[in-house]
């Protein structure tokens, strides 16, 4: 009969009422987190607010499509809401003063629901934005079906509705409660089921925390595990799409398409600007996957630990690991909302230049057609000057060749074109359904390119 000894050995390591005050972290951790959270809060609000302004400027100046602008603005708004809703309340109720009374149940429910919804809105925005770029790069003939204004609005609406549905169970499962209350439907350790050590709460009134309610344990578990499945699906889907986009970009850079032989008009040598745009896009794609994995995974692990078994069954080592992971997971999670503007600036020299101009309140960006008008005027002046020296046949051939030359790149993020840059051949962007109807200045000239990640 070895089984009776197991509960006794387990119960000797189980936390009890004396461990409840340890849900409040040490003072030096609080002070450190104040400084870290303050820096992250300012950087997050400033960076995402500037991102909204930058995308609006780039769209107005003809450097960025409206559909991509809508995706990026909605993503930045969800990040801002994560900071405004999540960080102040979470720092106060979880880090600074976690022990409270049961009168804060409503605020606990609302905060948890809104924070969860905004967090998963950010996650799903990364998915839809990656999907839109995946179709544009890997399946250009189908791009028009997902790139229209109505389709983009539907995708953004899908993101927010799905995020609210993912967070909805927490509205019922969360509240303020003494953390060691037994879960009625949970088959825990024998000592906890037979003993009254967890049934009797201390007489102190401020020993409740914002946590899952014992009467809604099954709902809480289903919500956390379901949200984790959503995270894994998004992570694997984004990784799959980014890997395929990188393959297409690298193969096109080497002179061959993924599905067959490259068309004759795509075999010409490409400029250094186009190759740089591809390298920047590949770096951007890799950083997206790394950010989702590194910044979100610690917080997901902590949530899984909270849902794996009720707190009255936690061992001391389990409880200690949870409390150590808590500040790190929260910090990395908020960093994920700060990184998005940094990814844009890293992968685009044009975005970085306008971003600095917005922060300095000194916008000097010209319209995308400005440089082209100057080049067209310069070419027409040169052609007029040389017309008297060359036969008409050569002049007409030169003008016809100039009209056929386009500058189209693969990356959404595009650097400014130089007047003396060599003419480039068509890329995968020319295969996009709506590219043929657009003038060269919208997709070919300065600024953000058609294929953004």
From Swiss-Prot:
Which keywords fit this entry according to its UniProt record?
Cell membrane, Disulfide bond, G-protein coupled receptor, Glycoprotein, Membrane, Metal-binding, Phosphoprotein, Receptor, Transducer, Transmembrane, Transmembrane helix, Zinc
Q: Which GO terms describe its molecular function?
A: G protein-coupled receptor activity; metal ion binding
Biased region (Low complexity) positions are 418-435
Q: Which family does it belong to?
A: Belongs to the G-protein coupled receptor 1 family.
Q: What is the annotated role of this protein in its UniProt record?
A: Zinc-sensing receptor that can sense changes in extracellular Zn(2+), mediate Zn(2+) signal transmission, and participates in the regulation of numerous physiological processes including glucose homeostasis regulation, gastrointestinal mobility, hormone secretion and cell death. Activation by Zn(2+) in keratinocytes increases the intracellular concentration of Ca(2+) and activates the ERK/MAPK and PI3K/AKT signaling pathways leading to epithelial repair.
Assembly and partners?
Interacts with HTR1A. Interacts with GALR1.
From the Swiss-Prot or TrEMBL record, give the protein name. G-protein coupled receptor 39
Protein species of origin? Homo sapiens (Human)
């Amino acid at each position: 009969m070895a089984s009776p000894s197991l509960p006794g050995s387990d119960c000797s390591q189980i936390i009890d009422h004396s461990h409840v005050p340890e849900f409040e972290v040490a003072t030096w951790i609080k002070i450190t987190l104040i400084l870290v959270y303050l820096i992250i809060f300012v950087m997050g609000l400033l960076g995402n607010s500037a991102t909204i302004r930058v995308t609006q400027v780039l769209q107005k100046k003809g450097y960025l499509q409206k559909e991509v602008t809508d995706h990026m603005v909605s993503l930045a708004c969800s990040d801002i809401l994560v900071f405004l809703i999540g960080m102040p309340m979470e720092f106060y109720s979880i880090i600074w003063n976690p022990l409270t009374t049961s009168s804060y149940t409503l605020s606990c429910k609302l905060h948890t629901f809104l924070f969860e919804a905004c967090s998963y809105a950010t996650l799903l925005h990364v998915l839809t934005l990656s999907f839109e770029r995946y179709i544009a790069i890997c399946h250009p003939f189908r791009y028009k079906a997902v790139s229209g204004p109505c389709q983009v609005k539907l995708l953004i609406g899908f993101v927010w509705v799905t995020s609210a549905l993912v967070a909805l169970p927490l509205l019922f499962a969360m509240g303020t409660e003494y953390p060691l209350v037994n879960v009625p439907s949970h088959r825990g350790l024998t000592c906890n089921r037979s003993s009254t050590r967890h049934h009797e709460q201390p007489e102190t009134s401020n020993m409740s925390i914002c946590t899952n309610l014992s009467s809604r344990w099954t709902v809480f578990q289903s919500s956390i595990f379901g949200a984790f499945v959503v995270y894994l699906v998004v992570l694997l889907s984004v990784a799959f799409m980014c890997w395929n986009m990188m393959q297409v970009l690298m193969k096109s850079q080497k002179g061959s398409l993924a599905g067959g032989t490259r068309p004759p008009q795509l075999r010409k040598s490409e400029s250094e600007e186009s190759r740089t745009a591809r390298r920047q896009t590949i770096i951007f794609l890799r950083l997206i996957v790394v950010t989702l994995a590194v910044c979100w995974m610690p917080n997901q692990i902590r949530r899984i630990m909270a849902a794996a078994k009720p707190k009255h069954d936690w061992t001391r080592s389990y409880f200690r690991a949870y409390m150590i992971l808590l500040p790190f997971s929260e910090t990395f999670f908020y960093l994920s909302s700060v990184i998005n503007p940094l990814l844009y600036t890293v992968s685009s020299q044009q975005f970085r230049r306008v971003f600095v101009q917005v922060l300095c309140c000194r916008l000097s960006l010209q319209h995308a057609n400005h440089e082209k008008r100057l080049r067209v005027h310069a070419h027409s002046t040169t052609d007029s000057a040389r017309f008297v020296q060359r036969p008409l046949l050569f002049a007409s051939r030169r003008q016809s060749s100039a009209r056929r030359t386009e500058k189209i790149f693969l990356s959404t993020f595009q650097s400014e074109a130089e007047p003396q840059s060599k003419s480039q051949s068509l890329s995968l962007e020319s295969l996009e359904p709506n590219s043929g109807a657009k003038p060269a200045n919208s997709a070919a000239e300065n600024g953000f390119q058609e294929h953004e990640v």
